[in-house]
Amino acid sequence: MIPWLSSDSLFPPLHTALIQPNGLLAVGGDLSPRRLIEAYSQGIFPWFNDGDPILWWSPDPRMVLFPRELKVSRSLQKSLRKGNYEIRTDRNFTPVMRACAAPRRDSCGTWIQNKMIFAYSALHEMGFAHSVETWMDGELVGGLYGVALGRVFFGESMFSRVSNASKIAFVHLVRQLERWGFEMIDCQMKTAHLASLGAREIPREEFSQRLKELVNYMERGEKWCFDHEQVE
């Protein structure tokens, strides 16, 4: 039976998560910064539709990318070499989330609701949630956002308005994280898109153990600035 969380409840052990649907661990609780940091540090993330209660997940296996295993296709390399774009970080976090929330061709809705945008924007103000943005001709054309704790980046969502724009942001993110000493990027669930970039599945138990070694709780994060950016 899936437990319902109150505002002060602890998450149940990961091994109690359901097999089907894969990884459903708990229901309820809140999206406060404290709760979200507690969740991510244990390998748990919220994912639910508008009108539903908050659902908390820890799937097995877990899709991850180790920065050294990044794969860049020839077509993506060509897009990167063009250099007709600018990468910015943490400049437009909430607009990136709203762009990720926009309906896609293959769906009419999104799980990124206003309450999620509000919650992650609060994490962003604390320096734990970050956006990586691809700009062309002064317009935001792609990007991604996620949560950084210790030496792990937890990817949440991506969007593209022009071909390869989100992948360009992702490649720059991975290369910068490797320079900063990050060792793992959480991609949550398997997709062909992520697999093409080098992500692979590992057992939840291994993922959990790696988190214990790599995630360090900090009272406050910091705004990101990639090596090529000018500090303002």
Swiss-Prot record:
Example GO BP: protein catabolic process
EC code(s) of this entry: 2.3.2.6
Reaction(s) catalysed by this chain's protein: N-terminal L-lysyl-[protein] + L-leucyl-tRNA(Leu) = N-terminal L-leucyl-L-lysyl-[protein] + tRNA(Leu) + H(+); N-terminal L-arginyl-[protein] + L-leucyl-tRNA(Leu) = N-terminal L-leucyl-L-arginyl-[protein] + tRNA(Leu) + H(+); L-phenylalanyl-tRNA(Phe) + an N-terminal L-alpha-aminoacyl-[protein] = an N-terminal L-phenylalanyl-L-alpha-aminoacyl-[protein] + tRNA(Phe)
Gene Ontology CC: cytoplasm
Pfam family, one: Leu_Phe_trans
Subcellular location: Cytoplasm
Keyword rRNA processing annotated: no
An MF annotation (GO) of this entry: leucyl-tRNA--protein transferase activity
Chief place of localization: cytoplasm
Superkingdom classification of source: Bacteria
Keywords associated with the record: Acyltransferase, Cytoplasm, Transferase
Family: Belongs to the L/F-transferase family.
Function: Functions in the N-end rule pathway of protein degradation where it conjugates Leu, Phe and, less efficiently, Met from aminoacyl-tRNAs to the N-termini of proteins containing an N-terminal arginine or lysine.
Full protein name: Leucyl/phenylalanyl-tRNA--protein transferase
Biological source species: Nitrosospira multiformis (strain ATCC 25196 / NCIMB 11849 / C 71)
